[in-house]
Amino acid sequence: MDTIKIFNHGEFDTIRNELVNLLKVVKWNTINSNVTVSSTDTIDISDCIREILYKQFKNVRNIEVSSDISFIKYNRFNDTTLTDDNVGYYLVIYLNRTKSVKTLIYPTPETVITSSEDIMFSKSLNFRFENVKRDYKLVMCSISLTYKPSICRIQYDNNKYLDISDSQECNNLCYCVITMDPHHLIDLETICVLVDKSGKCLLVNEFYIRFRKNHIYNSFADLCMDHIFELPNTKELFTLRNDDGRNIAWDNDKLESGNNTWIPKTDDEYKFLSKLMNIAKFNNTKFDYYVLVGDTDPCTVFTFKVTKYYINLNYE
């Protein structure tokens, strides 16, 4: 994640009441101080928080949530140094979602981000709370995220970077660099397609020349029938199938029906595709074989080498 994430859709509503009930049995500390609780109850709450966070973050291998939960009772002038440890994140959950209590975070001395929503931010950032004068109105706990290894990160737009991974988990698009074994019916050597989780293919480039017109096919076999053969009217001669029932990009248990296909529209999105093409030029040592069979007599076999780059792009 970035250094700050604001949760403004009630993601933690399911455990807010549990925190309020836990507070009722907590022995209060001196006035204007926080109380840290660790018990079997907080372990259960931490487990719930972990499950919620897993749904929020992509490409995360492991999430650790401390079972130490702090009920905060600072006023606006208190310092907020809770620990000397600046590795990981703080998660702040408001006990009630009134807009009076605010979290102020300072990414730079000249910049302040103010939020009255549940929020998670890096421990390395300076922060304070505002309008926390009476009672315990929010809780804090420590979070540690471990990400799955990525090949690299590339810029998607002015404010966002995307991880490029060789793992299907938590991703929804696959950029496939496809090299074709020589065959007298095939006119191409390399094409690149973007495959969504329904199996639809967007033709991106061939020989590293990018298409500006968006050609979308329901499957890689459909793309091949339309694009790679020298013969005219190929559809009248044979059809293609994969005898293993495999998709070119995804394991069958990862496929989902009814997905909308991502289509580049803006200059930033086309620049992103160009960067993806450049990454593929220099990271193409690992590949899988994919085979399509034409129903001729005897069968015609087409063999492809496929290098896969997985990304997660929110576009629905």
From Swiss-Prot:
Signal peptide start-end: none
GO annotations of cellular component type: host cell cytoplasm; host cell nucleus
Upregulating conditions: Expressed in the early phase of the viral replicative cycle.
InterPro entries the UniProt entry points to: Poxvirus_C4/C10
Keyword Ribonucleoprotein: no
Protein name, UniProt field: Protein C4
Keyword Nucleotidyltransferase: no
Native source organism of the sequence: Vaccinia virus (strain Western Reserve) (VACV)
Keywords for this protein: Early protein, Host cytoplasm, Host nucleus
